């Protein structure tokens, strides 16, 4: 892997978004994992309002809409993702109570205590776990829920190679007890915490691997695109090598 760029955020956003636009989910996850997390959420009705922050093209949002009767708003920075999101909702006949809007998770377009549930799979790291929990809390009604996935250490100690990679890629990565403590300090009652199964990661990396050839052909001679694919391959290699030490964890909390 090229050492020129050490984190995903150092690459051209247009290249990143184009890379992820061809897949249903832009990060590790599955219908089963989404439904497992949803099973811990109580009291949602037709009058409830849900926001999926960093929704991407809406793979997990469609699952939510098919299983709860609420109004759902997907928020995503990239307009092409939102176009796909809304087309997917139309195709699944869900557009009457869900829509995607272009927005920034640092400046969400909601009123205080407007939402009953905030959802975010594989996206809160863009603003940071602690910041996201603290800043988004005001949009939740009292007793409202937040459900997010976060890259997390499974052990107190880990090999230097993976420690160095993730400290550079996402310095807020931490252990489960520390993440739960951060949730409590942000004003939530921790409801559930569970590890996202490794099959979500292996399926995700397998799907992405299949897109590399066509992506590189599209960007033939583009050094940035080539470096980005190399970065993604390196990240996958590290996961297969060190998956015992880290992965996604679902954190579900209730505003108190």
Predicted regions and their residues:
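A short SAM/SAH-binding and catalytic strip from SAM-dependent methyltransferases
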Residues: 117-130
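Class I SAM-dependent methyltransferase SAM/SAH-binding core
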Residues: 51-53, 57-107
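Conserved Class I S-adenosyl-L-methionine
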Residues: 194-256
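Short, glycine-/aromatic-enriched active-site segment of Class I SAM-dependent methyltransferases
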Residues: 151-170
């Amino acid at each position: 892997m090229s050492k020129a760029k050490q984190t995903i955020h150092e690459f051209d956003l247009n290249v990143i978004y184009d890379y992820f636009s061809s897949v249903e989910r832009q990060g590790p996850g599955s219908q089963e994992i989404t439904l497992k997390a949803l099973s811990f959420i109580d009291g949602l009705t037709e009058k409830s309002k849900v926001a999926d922050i960093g929704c991407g093209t809406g793979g997990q949002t469609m699952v939510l809409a098919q299983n709860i009767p609420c109004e759902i708003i997907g928020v995503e920075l990239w307009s092409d993702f939102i176009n796909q999101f809304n087309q997917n909702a139309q195709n699944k006949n869900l557009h009457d109570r869900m829509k995607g809007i272009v927005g920034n998770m640092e400046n969400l377009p909601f009123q205080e205590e407007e939402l009953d549930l905030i959802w975010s799979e594989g996206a809160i790291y863009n603003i940071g776990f602690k910041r996201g929990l603290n800043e988004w809390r005001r949009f939740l009604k009292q007793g409202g829920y937040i459900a997010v996935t976060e890259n997390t250490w499974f052990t107190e100690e880990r090999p230097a190679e993976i420690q160095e990679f993730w400290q550079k890629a996402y310095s807020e990565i931490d252990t489960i007890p520390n993440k739960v403590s951060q949730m409590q300090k942000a004003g939530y009652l921790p409801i559930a915490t569970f590890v996202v199964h490794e099959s979500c990661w292996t399926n995700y990396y397998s799907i992405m691997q299949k897109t590399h050839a066509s992506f590189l052909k599209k960007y033939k001679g583009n050094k940035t695109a080539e470096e980005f694919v190399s970065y993604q391959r390196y990240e996958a290699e590290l996961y297969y090598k060190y998956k015992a030490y880290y992965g996604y964890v679902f954190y579900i909390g209730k505003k108190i």
